[in-house]
Amino acid sequence: MKPSRLSSLDPVKMPEWRWAPFLSHAINAFIPLKPEPYPVAPEFLQREGKTGSKSQPIRVTTCTWACRTKKFRQVRAACVEAGRSASVLNFVINPYHTFDLPFFGADLVTLPSGHLLALDLQPAITSDERHTKQVWERLMPIFEHWRVHLPEGGPIPEEAKPYFSPGFLWTRLPLSIEGNQLIDEVIMPAFKDYLNLYLDLVEMAEEVSPQRAFKLLEGQKRYLSYRAKKDPARAMLARFHGHQWTESYIHNVLFDL
């Protein structure tokens, strides 16, 4: 059978996938940046699996959309559709370490227990004001504008705090008409605002000195190492596609620096 996706830039086509409008908006926003395919092994471009019971199996599709640009080392979207079991968009922008930029992160997850939704511009070096000040000054008004419309998602583990900004927008919503309305009326415009700010920061960013670039690279490596070690999707992906595939996907695609 011919693979349905041959390039990381090929469209992600998953009927009923909840998060398609979010990825579509992001992809359109990248068009002026002239994105090129990011190298992703064929077995990770699209993977089919099953979950559920023998009598009521549920089809699982996992796709990876990815690109790179002049200032982005890797932009990647991990997309999962598993019917009533899960619907996921994990979207991360990894800038080149030669630019003093944070990561962009969006984690949009639907599980049987509800929606878990998070947006952030995540710092590579939290303690470095040169790295964070200009970002947080512009991010916090956006965060404050949208946070009042959403319930709190809960506390952040102490060990994770260095990897998030004060503008970490994090909420849990019920599987209900009200939850869907908040996704459409709050989460989607917040996603657009966070992404617009990020792309504005990227446009203004200029290359840094080799010494500064080395410091940023070390910060990026710490962040990605932590994310790979603590990836909350690990158990779900292993259940859908097996342990070996999942570990390779996490370390060689999602957090590959």
From Swiss-Prot:
* One BP term from GO: phytochromobilin biosynthetic process
Q: According to its UniProt record, which reaction does this protein catalyse? A: (3Z)-phycoerythrobilin + oxidized 2[4Fe-4S]-[ferredoxin] = 15,16-dihydrobiliverdin + reduced 2[4Fe-4S]-[ferredoxin] + 2 H(+)
The alphabetical list of record keywords is: Oxidoreductase
Q: Which NCBIfam families match?
A: PRK13249.1
Provide the function of this protein. Catalyzes the two-electron reduction of the C2 and C3(1) diene system of 15,16-dihydrobiliverdin.
**What family is this?**
Belongs to the HY2 family.
Q: Mind telling me what this protein is named?
A: Phycoerythrobilin:ferredoxin oxidoreductase
Q: From which lineage does this chain's organism come? A: Bacteria, Bacillati, Cyanobacteriota, Cyanophyceae, Synechococcales
User: What is the name of the gene encoding this protein?
Assistant: pebB
